[in-house]
């Protein structure tokens, strides 16, 4: 049996956050690693989705091309995945020759088979900008709750919208009211496949039940699908009037085009009737219908392609019991996480916290507690005490005659074998939480056995060998089963054991034991909490200003030179720095301005150490009204720049007298 495992294509308008990792990429990698562990033939295919309005909007906002945005975030996403140890056999992009060619072939075949037709629709057109407006180019008020809404979605009430439903619509480029014009679009005759899709979903034995149920509900009211857009960025529709394919008809075709990058072997997974293969898609639950209904419909329409065997739909991840929001920066980015903590800790926590098909929450407190009291106190404790004791007594895993083992030894080894069987079943059912809990239970059994045997009190060397052999065998099973979840930490344990990733005990010399699982410190968790809260406050302020500007059509306010000269900016030098007692973020800083010293309260704690600040030249606003922060008076402000959470104080590039005025 050959396996093809795919992950939902990451959208190249931003980097990855923990929600992406939890729903899709980590579980897919765990599943792939386990199949490899069992010596099964498996390819892991993924990539990025590079077309659609959000990318063109971001490019326009930044004054760059869509390809610039795609290149930037394709690379950033791949770096994020690499940092989580998520590996691929093929990682492609939809803005590539092989994908565009494959997508156009699919479209032509659908048309030849009678599944594509033309239809006149109504859509917004902006006279001022001389362009048709795709859904994301229009904003206004939601017709249901009157909240601020995009042309396709209301963030307030969560409803899907059509652009023409909006109240008080306006073009996001010029803020003018668009008019409705008629346009010819191309539609996919999905409604004709109702019976075929119902039969496919009903008979898909490995499809999770919640995915089946959602798909069957949608199929009941199946309607045709507008698959063209009046845009220039995308996969061109052959022989059309300059339109491109809607991303949700061309993006899933990436699973085929990216497999093609492996060579002719791609046919074994997608076409060949002579090769047994299974296709498993890992996705987030927000795109379940696209993969369980729309994508199978496309495959049915082109004919001769194999159908997905399973669509594994991961639930949503909230953050501190609130919905994640990239626009509000209420999110933990993968890059920020791995700079502080082991990616293995994230892989473990996100899988053990809840069944994959259910929504769950990421909280910094729960993360710390689960890692410290479960992973480290149970698995880490058993592994460390076993290796320390065995290395000190024997220098290697002792060799024993299996028929001399006592019943209590055999009982634990049989538990290892039984756990392996249960674990296999759970992984193949995508039940990663319960699979990890089996490892935890086995580790508890190991700890209980170690404690009951009291190896430190055993005087018979042969009996001690049997006990430590049993402990090391149990540890080998734990490492083997845990390896798909925590490839780095288990690799370090195997290195100490001088063993291979299998269930055989070779009895090689052990290396000097060291602590593999280190506890999460309170200060590190506190810093991540403070970073999250400070960023959300900043984003809320920016968002409020942007919304006001949108409503009024306002641009950035320009000021006269006289206004600027009212600000008294001077060069100073930091003399003293101490903590503000009532604050976790503030320093009390004494600055020398040449002819006087000022006391300034600044939120630089966490960005600069005390030693870094003392003696540093700084730029000071000297004519601010004094203000009290945490009960301490501040007589000015230091100037600093901030980007992506990095703070940098403004400085001067040559020696100049303290107190010098900045013009």
Curated annotation (Swiss-Prot):
It comes from the Archaea. Its cofactor is Zn(2+). Residues 563-663 form the tRNA-binding domain. Coiled coil: none annotated. The keyword Chaperone does not apply. Keywords: Aminoacyl-tRNA synthetase, ATP-binding, Cytoplasm, Ligase, Metal-binding, Nucleotide-binding, Protein biosynthesis, RNA-binding, tRNA-binding, Zinc. It is found in: Cytoplasm. Zn(2+) binds at residues 142, 145, 154, 157. InterPro entries: Anticodon_Met (IPR041872), M/V/L/I-tRNA-synth_anticd-bd (IPR013155), Met-tRNA-synth_bsu_C (IPR004495), Met-tRNA_ligase_1 (IPR023458), Met-tRNA_synth (IPR014758), Methionyl/Leucyl_tRNA_Synth (IPR015413), MetRS_core (IPR033911), MetRS_Zn (IPR029038). Binds 1 zinc ion per subunit. Is required not only for elongation of protein synthesis but also for the initiation of all mRNA translation through initiator tRNA(fMet) aminoacylation. Belongs to the class-I aminoacyl-tRNA synthetase family. MetG type 1 subfamily. This is Methionine--tRNA ligase. The gene is metG.
């Amino acid at each position: 049996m050959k396996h093809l495992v795919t992950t939902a294509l990451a959208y190249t308008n931003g980097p990855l956050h923990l929600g992406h990792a939890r729903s899709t990429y980590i579980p897919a990698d765990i599943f792939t690693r386990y199949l490899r562990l069992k010596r099964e033939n498996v390819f892991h295919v993924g990539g990025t989705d590079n077309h659609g309005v959000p990318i063109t909007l971001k490019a326009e906002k930044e004054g760059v091309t869509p390809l610039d945005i795609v290149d930037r975030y394709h690379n950033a996403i791949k770096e994020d995945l690499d940092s989580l140890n998520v590996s691929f056999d093929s990682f492609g992009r939809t803005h590539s020759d092989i994908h565009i060619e494959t997508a156009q072939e699919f479209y032509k075949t659908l048309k030849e088979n009678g599944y594509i037709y033309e239809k006149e629709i109504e859509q917004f057109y902006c006279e001022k900008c001389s362009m048709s407006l795709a859904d994301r180019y229009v904003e206004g008020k939601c017709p249901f709750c009157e909240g601020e809404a995009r042309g396709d979605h209301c963030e307030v009430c969560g409803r899907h919208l059509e652009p023409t439903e909006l109240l008080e619509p306006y073009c996001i480029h010029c803020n003018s009211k668009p008019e409705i014009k008629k346009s010819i679009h191309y539609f996919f005759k999905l409604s004709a496949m109702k019976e075929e899709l119902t039969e496919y979903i009903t008979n898909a034995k490995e499809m999770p039940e919640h995915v089946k149920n959602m798909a069957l509900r949608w199929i009941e009211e199946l309607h045709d699908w507008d698959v063209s857009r009046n845009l220039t960025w995308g996969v061109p529709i052959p022989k059309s009037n300059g339109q491109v394919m809607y991303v949700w008809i061309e993006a899933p075709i990436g699973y085929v085009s990216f497999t093609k990058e492996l060579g002719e072997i791609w046919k074994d997974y997608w076409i060949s009737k002579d090769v047994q293969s299974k296709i498993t898609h890992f996705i987030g639950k927000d795109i379940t219908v696209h993969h369980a209904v729309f994508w199978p419909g496309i495959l049915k329409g082109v004919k001769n392609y194999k159908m997905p065997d399973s669509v594994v739909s991961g639930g949503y991840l909230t953050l501190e019991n609130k919905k994640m929001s990239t626009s509000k920066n209420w999110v933990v980015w993968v890059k920020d996480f791995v700079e502080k903590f082991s990616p293995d800790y994230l892989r473990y926590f996100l899988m053990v916290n809840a069944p994959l098909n259910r929504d769950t929450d990421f909280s910094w407190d729960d993360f710390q507690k689960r890692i410290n009291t479960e992973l480290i106190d149970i698995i880490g404790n058993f592994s460390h005490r076993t290796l320390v004791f065995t290395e000190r007594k024997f220098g290697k895993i002792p060799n024993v005659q299996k028929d001399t083992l006592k019943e209590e030894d055999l009982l634990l080894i049989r538990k290892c074998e039984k756990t392996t069987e249960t674990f296999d079943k759970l992984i193949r059912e995508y039940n990663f939480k319960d699979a990890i809990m089996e490892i935890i239970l086995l580790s508890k059994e190991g700890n209980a056995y170690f404690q009951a045997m009291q190896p430190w009190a055993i005087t018979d060397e042969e009996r001690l060998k049997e006990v430590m052999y049993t402990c090391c065998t149990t540890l080998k099973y734990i490492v083997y089963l845990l390896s798909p979840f925590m490839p780095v930490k288990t690799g370090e344990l195997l290195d100490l054991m001088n063993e291979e990733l299998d269930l055989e005990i070779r009895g090689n010399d052990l290396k000097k034991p060291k602590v593999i699982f280190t506890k999460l410190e309170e200060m590190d968790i506190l810093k991540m909490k403070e970073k999250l809260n400070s960023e959300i406050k900043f984003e809320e302020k920016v968002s409020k200003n942007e919304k006001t500007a949108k409503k009024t059509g306002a641009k950035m306010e320009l000021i006269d030179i006289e206004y600027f000269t009212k600000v008294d900016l001077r060069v100073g030098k930091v003399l003293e720095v101490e903590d503000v007692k009532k604050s976790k973020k503030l320093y009390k800083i004494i600055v020398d301005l040449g002819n006087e010293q000022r006391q300034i309260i600044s939120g630089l704690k966490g960005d600069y150490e005390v030693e870094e600040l003392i003696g540093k030249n700084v730029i000071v606003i000297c004519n601010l009204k004094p203000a009290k922060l945490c009960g301490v008076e501040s007589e000015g402000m230091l100037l600093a720049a901030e980007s992506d959470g990095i703070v940098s104080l403004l400085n001067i590039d040559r020696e100049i007298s303290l107190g010098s005025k900045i013009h």
